[in-house]
Amino acid sequence: MDGGVGEEGKQQPHLVLAHKLFLLSHPDVDDLAKVDLRADVLAAVKSDDMASLYESLGAGGVLETDAALLAEMRGRIEEEIRKLDEKIADAEENLGESEVREAHLAKSLYFIRVGEKEKALEQLKVTEGKTVAVGQKMDLVFHTLQIGFFYMDFDLISKSIDKAKKLFEEGGDWERKNRLKVYEGLYCMATRNFKKAASLFLDSISTFTTYELFPYDTFIFYTVLTSVISLDRVSLKAKVVDAPEILAVIGKVPHLSEFLNSLYNCQYKSFFAAFSGLTEQIKLDRYLQPHFRYYMREVRTVVYSQFLESYKSVTMEAMASAFGVTVDFIDLELSRFIAAGKLHCKIDKVACVLETNRPDARNAFYQATIKQGDFLLNRIQKLSRVIDL
């Protein structure tokens, strides 16, 4: 299907393979599960004649290399490329521009299928040169983006997103524009820009058709996770907690509904239990895993800040009880977050009391005004010295 558009629930096979390769290298996946994963990876590699990947996996000790199988794969690839080149030559000699483009596209898709990254990108450029319609050019960008996500090539992804946006200045339909939002949202999430990812995902909830990247329930999982650390309570309620599209699916993802609703409803014991259940899913996600520790800190910052907003002072024991943890745990946690400037409070160790000292909006505005005034005064003084000279 052109542009790699996914049928409902149909993820792009190479992205399924990429996730399995990620799990194979993950220390938290047990050896028995890795036996099945290895078999799945080998079957996928053989099915698509991914000779270069097979060779590199063999060199890395992930798979055992069979020289005869590798030679068979390479032989089939050479034969198929010969046929594709013949079709291109025939189209150029006997057929129209549309058929020539289709023949070049077929060669591009074949290089993608067998996992020849550089050849695929080169052939996609050739195909683009034969392409006039903006929509078809966009489809080529989506193919490039999928290659980028398979290899986690963020430079390629970033450049392709910029290219797509420039193409949309020439035209383009809303369906493709909406799909691009999900691609960009995934890129933002994978590069730790959770706030922008949440915004793009929320914009795409009612128009989601990007099944080639991931199923809809995974999309909702990402949307909730990014929104929780990016939105204020009012926005979270309107856009996430009460969103019908999220309500329809959230129950399919273990712990996600309790995670979201217990946070919003200030049920902190339930929140910690649900959060603990979600950590495994976050750790085993190839896009989120590199940011696991960062995300854990951000979520705890949100929930501790929310709890403390209700008090001018509160005992450590009361807070520990609310979260279902020990006083020592809360003491250690808050000490770290206060030292890092994440929480606006101080600990009275003698009385075992937390005292909040967050600046209110008026105070924050006052401090900002003073800062800007000092900056302006310094500029004026520098200017006056220059004039005096």
Swiss-Prot record:
A Pfam family: RPN7_PSMD6_C
Keyword check for Membrane: no
GO biological process entries: proteasome-mediated ubiquitin-dependent protein catabolic process
Record-linked PROSITE patterns: PCI
Protein name: 26S proteasome non-ATPase regulatory subunit 6
Gene3D superfamilies attached to this UniProt entry: 1.25.40.570
Source species of the chain: Oryza sativa subsp. japonica (Rice)
Domain PCI: 193-361
